[in-house]
Regions:
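Substrate-binding pocket helix/loop in short-chain dehydrogenase/reductase
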Residues: 89-90, 97-102
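Conserved NAD(P)H cofactor-binding loop of Rossmann-fold oxidoreductase domains
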Residues: 81-86
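Conserved glycine-rich Rossmann-like NAD(P)H-binding loop of the short-chain dehydrogenase/reductase
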Residues: 26-41
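Catalytic loop of short-chain dehydrogenase/reductase
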Residues: 129-140
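Conserved glycine-rich cofactor-binding loop
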Residues: 12-13
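A short, exposed helix-loop element centered on a Lys and neighboring polar residues
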Residues: 113-114
Length: 140
């Protein structure tokens, strides 16, 4: 069997980058996406592929999925690590801010599951892990 493949959304820094390094140490091939160039730098260091993009952008999410499948022919693990909901008092948070949070936190999970499930079923399995944060500014 060929090496397993891990796709990480939010894989440029922090927990996403740490997960990329851990998966690389376990001999996974990597595909990384983040809005900054940090994903490209890390992918080059670890021998993976990268695409700058935002999780809430449907086209960019599909582009990294398609690039991963084109490059590696499979996806075994997906980590979606994105920001959290708006901060502040409930009554002060606008409907628009909640909509933006859903676009960032919830929709990428649904979109990636719809893309990956047929592939993972055909392969006989896989895993999708979703992580979000709330009010995290530094590790404890």
């Amino acid at each position: 069997m060929s090496k397993k493949v891990c796709l990480i959304i939010g894989g440029g820094r922090g927990m996403g980058a740490a997960t990329a390094r851990q998966m690389h140490s376990r001999k996974y091939k990597l595909a990384l996406m983040s809005p900054s160039t940090s994903c490209e730098t890390l992918a080059a260091e670890l021998g993976g592929i990268a695409l700058r993009g935002r999780a809430e952008n449907k086209g960019e999410l599909k582009a990294i999925f398609d690039l991963t499948m084109l490059t590696y022919g499979r996806i075994d693990s997906i980590l979606i690590h994105v920001g959290g909901p708006p901060k502040g008092d409930l009554l002060d948070i606008s409907e628009e801010d909640w909509d933006k949070a859903n676009d960032m936190v919830l929709k990428p999970v649904i979109r990636m599951a719809k893309l990956a499930t047929p592939v993972m079923e055909k392969q006989g399995g896989g895993s999708i892990v979703n992580i979000t944060t709330f009010s995290a500014f530094e590790p404890s």
